[in-house]
Amino acid sequence: MTWKMGPHFTMLLAMWLVCGSASQSSALDSDGRPGRKVPLASPISSRSARYLRHTGRSGGVEKSTQEEPNPQSFQRRKSVPVLRLAHPTVRPPPSGINGAPVRPELKPIARGSASEMVRDEGSSARTRMLRFPSGSSSPNILASFAGKNRVWVISAPHASEGYYRLMMSLLKDDVYCELAERHIQQIVLFHQAGEEGGKVRRITSEGQILEQPLDPNLIPKLMSFLKLEKGKFSMVLLKKTLQVEERYPYPVRLEAMYEVIDQGPIRRIEKIRQKGFVQKCKASGIEGHVVQEGNNGGGGGGSTGLGSDKRKEDPRRTQIHPTREPPRKQTTTKAATPQPPPTPRATTLPPAPVTTATRATSRVVTVAARPTTTTAYPATQRPWTSRLHPFSVSHRPPATAEMTTVRGPSVSEQLYPLPRKEQQREKPQATRRPNKATNYGSFTATPPTTLWEGSTRAVGTSRFRDNRTDKREHGHQDPNVVPGPHKPIKGKLPKKKEKILSNEYEAKYDLSRPTTSQGEEELQVDNIPSQNAKESKKHEKPEKPEKEKKKKGKSAKPDKLLRSEKQMKKAEKKSKQEKEKTKKKKAGKTEQDDYQKPTAKHLAPSPRKSVADLLGSFEGKRRLLLITTPKAENNMYVQQRDEYLESFCKMATRRISVVTIFGPVNNSSMKIDHFQLDNEKPMRVVDDEDLVDQHLISELRKEYGMTYNDFFMVLTDVDLRVKQYYEVPIAMKSVFDLIDTFQSRIKDMEKQKKEGITCKEDKRQSLENFLSRFRWRRRLLVISAPNDEDWAYSQQLSALNGQACNFGLRHITILKLLGVGEEVGGILELFPINGSSTVEREDVPAHLVKDIRNYFQVSPEYFSMLLVGKDGNVKSWYPSPMWSMVIVYDLIDSMQLRRQEMAIQQSLGMRCPEDEYAGYGYHSYHQGYQDGYQDDYRHHESYHHGYPY
């Protein structure tokens, strides 16, 4: 048996030697002879390597190629891994250039593998989806909102459509935090042929709106998917599952939409999770700001490598100015020497940040304090931004944490000190702004800087004084430090400047108006030629009769005529020279006086109008209605203003002028409106600068006891004595009734009757003024028909018979719009709010009928009826006549404001007769409502539920 085993043993030994020599020769070829190619790769092994590379399993293979100390061409790198797969046990563990063991995972290896892994079809598709998300130009735009956001789709024919404009007017800047808190995103579609377009309005967590244009080709697809009707305004509210939650055929108040959303169970969880969200959102200060974006989805959230992240951070670090303290250098050496600590801290970065740290330490020579921010990773840069991430505090080195607490208070002042040139450039603005802010509160807080501000605006006389103050203020290092006390300038001129500059009409009046000192100069200079002209006239007067004598006597000689002409020329030359001399002297005197004594005696009689002068222009001619309001948007003032603007004609016949004072007591502006008849001469009582004269306004306030910052109103007669005080807005009818009892008014009425003076209301009353007449006072029931013989219109009129009490108690006004084309007209029926049966009727002009139909999108060719609430929004639409008004009353009585009215009316005992409305009286309805009467009309809740008005 031993002789049989011998050949087998020798064969095994020979094969072992051959294999060993082959592996050694391959190792020598790869290490010692890089120029030779190794022909030992079998086709099977190469196919397996290609298969692994294509399926994404060649990560280990690619790593081994990167571990070679001297890699050559791409073909060589491609061939080496095949040998490794064929003989995995022969090769020793990988080593570096100097023989030191290499870490298994290095940053360059990851980069190399990533470049090879691009061949993977699945990963490239994923990265493509991340780089180009479903944006506004993508057909699956709704899919980007699925599971995350609710979608509010607004569809309109075009941007100028009436309903669309009405809906956008309801979207004030202060509603977007509420929308963001409910995860609502908006899509606007314009579907009219030729004007197709739209936009996606993404609302951020700060309330900012990111607008992206919508691809017009997507409009028909979205319209068909959401089942929106073309040619009409409509809105759809989608759930987070993209199911339709609610449809709205006309604009609605946002409260109604909120109520629909808040009924969902998921909304309760959102409320718990997002406590204080709205307050934080509003505190950001950018609520309602619109930012236009491209149509790539605004995302760009692609998977960027770690290397690209480092490249993004480096330029941000290089921009930091050397404002930190030198001891921060110690943290640089600590971060540079130990390699393991950065690994758990910097977002799964292996020791690659070591190279960044060494690079940063080499820059310490040029910038002293920069290395701290470089080695501390993004966490150290966060304290310099406005928002702090929660992880930045825990991973920050202790030295940097101390420095942030020390530097914390100074961040609000100025983060990075500017160079000296920029400091000098920015100093005047820094000293000017805080004083402007304080001037709104009080005028005596910082007088030196206010004088400096005023003097920079002045041109001419005060320029020397300005230069000196400029030099003083440039000496201060801190821009927020108020300069030292200057010499107080006495007199009235600086105060006037100070007051004018401190009010809100500064830009309007102060830029175009010269200062009073210039006005004095111009007045004096203008007076001088007039005196010289008088003197020259005196010289010329005796010469004229001499000429006449010479002509009459005919005895004068030509030489005498020549002499007289020479004398005239000499006199003219002298007068011109005297004019120029006096101009120079006066100009020099005024400049010297202003330089040495800013308030000379000739400046004292300023053209400021006193209260006596102001009231003297009204006395015996006009009655005054004086109103004070803290701001022009004050609700009480707006209500009173709408009241008197509606009755322009009655104000004019009673000769009323309205003086309105805006702003607080110490910083007010004034507006004067004269209501006059057509045959009266237009009045101009004060100049523009007097409207912002604080002294005049404060004196006027004291004269009539209007020394508060609240709404207040005073009525006077033509003798300017106070007749009535009002602390709240009041109907102008009661004011007119009071005025008609004055003795002066009775005389005016008799005089106007004799002269036949009548006042016609404005022929072209605007739609806005007409609708503002009913806002927050009346509900409108608009009925439109092609003519008064229309069948539906006549049926509706029969249903309205005998409903005067119900209409009056519900504050309903009926507006009838009749006619087609040019033959149109309207009738307005006003029902008393006490429920009496008397009805006041007014004619509505043709142009207003057309405007109302266009505004509410009512077709003149068909019958239609709509209910408009007190807030001016359409509450319900009725395309056919309502045989019974029960449904209309149900809708009105379910509104929040109406419930308050019902409580007041019941306490006062105001009610309609039980038999008037066929057993559906006021009391019986109230009982039915308490018992759930509204459930019988549940189909109305989808459109009208939740309306507060």
UniProtKB/Swiss-Prot annotation:
Residues 487-498 have a biased composition (Basic residues). Belongs to the CCDC80 family. Isoform 2 is expressed in uterus, liver, lung, spleen, kidney, heart, bladder, skeletal muscle and brain (at protein level). Isoform 2 is expressed very low in mammary gland and intestine (at protein level). Isoform 2 is expressed in lactating mammary glands and mammary tumors (at protein level). Ubiquitous (isoform 1). Isoform 2 is expressed in ovary, uterus, mammary glands, liver, lung, spleen, kidney, heart, bladder, intestine, skeletal muscle and brain. Residues 24-79, 289-360, 408-609 are annotated as: Disordered. Residues 295-305 have a biased composition (Gly residues). GO terms for cellular component: basement membrane; extracellular matrix; extracellular region; interstitial matrix. This is Coiled-coil domain-containing protein 80. Glycans are attached at N467. Disulfide bonds: none annotated. It comes from Rattus norvegicus (Rat). Residues 308-328, 419-429, 463-477, 499-511, 534-548, 556-581 have a biased composition (Basic and acidic residues). Phosphorylated. One of its GO terms (molecular function) is glycosaminoglycan binding. GO terms for biological process: extracellular matrix organization; positive regulation of cell-substrate adhesion; response to bacterium. Residues 436-453 have a biased composition (Polar residues). It is found in: Secreted, Extracellular space, Extracellular matrix. It holds the Pfam family DUF4174.
